[in-house]
Amino acid sequence: MRKFLLRATCALALSAIAGQALAAPAMQVLGRDFSFPQPVEGLPAKLSDFKDLQINSFTTSDGVKLAYWEAGKGRPLIFVPGWSANGAEYINVMYLLSQHYRVIVLDPRNQGLSDQVAYGGRIARFSMDLKELTDHLGVKSADYCGWSMGAAVIWGYIDLFGTKGIRKACFVDEPISIYSHQDWTEQQRRDAGGTTTSAERMVAAVTQGGPANSLTTDMKPFERFMLRDSAAFANSEAFAAAVVKTDPDATARVLFDHVTNDWRDVVSHKIDVPVAIFSGEESNNLPSQRWAASVIPGARLYAYTAAEQGDHFLMFKNPVKFTTDLRAFLER
């Protein structure tokens, strides 16, 4: 009976999240506390330790209610998560940075606590959603940080709207073009970060459990994701799994468009603000991140070692180092 009541309570909470405007403390929106499984000094032991955390929402011009996580005061710092990711995974990053900034993490459409809809599954629409978030917040100038696909969303934003309003930008381990053109040289492929020559096979492998190998997709992020060799990462993933119910069919809608975009022209010609790029030696994306740092004027590359958790999930596995490095860049 207790299990039934718990499930019913959670279902009602999730229903309220999906159907109402959100503007409340995270504890109130989620309907319960959460205890992180592994104690980590300097990070919250329970959700209730993060008293400043709120979950809010706004509605886009095409009628989609998007959630965003917010904490802290000061200069705005806006995070855009990667494919299928959400603000809950940023719990430790937000906790550390909200002591210095107004930190905002957007749940993109079909991800996290945002609406699941059958339309708008394109990076260009995600970039418009980001623009509409800033308009909703009344933010005229902010620092932006995109991880994985979130970096592509910011590149799309820059392509559409330019860099006005972007004070500084941070990109974390996103290939410049996941799709590898068949007429590329090997050097061009490495510089762009291409990992597949078949977007269809890659999407099927990632979303439907289709056959996968290193010729259809980069297997390393999946291998590194399964490692729970960081207590902070284990905690943030446990929290996200407990409070966010991801629908694979919904998150899959943007993936084909994401895979086939080639951002080399935007990265090499349209970025004119200070940029930090994060990657590491446990990521196959490092060569493309070096290329990006070489073509963006004044860009700084942070390449983490294996001991520093330098893989696709570095910001979650080593949040103390990441937030320290990011703060140093933002305050330069």
Walk through the language-model features, giving the residues of each.
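Catalytic active-site module of serine/aspartate enzymes centered on a nucleophile-bearing elbow/loop
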Residues: 299-332
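Alpha/beta-hydrolase fold catalytic core
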Residues: 2-6, 22-77, 99-101, 139, ...
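Conserved serine/cysteine hydrolase catalytic core
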Residues: 245-294
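Conserved HGGG/HGGXW glycine-rich cap/lid loop of the alpha/beta-hydrolase fold
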Residues: 61-116
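Alpha/beta-hydrolase active-site loop signature
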Residues: 84, 108-112, 151, 176, ...
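Flexible "cap/lid" loop of the alpha/beta hydrolase fold
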Residues: 155, 166-208
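Active-site loop/oxyanion-hole signature of alpha/beta-hydrolase fold enzymes
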Residues: 61, 69, 105-149, 160, ...
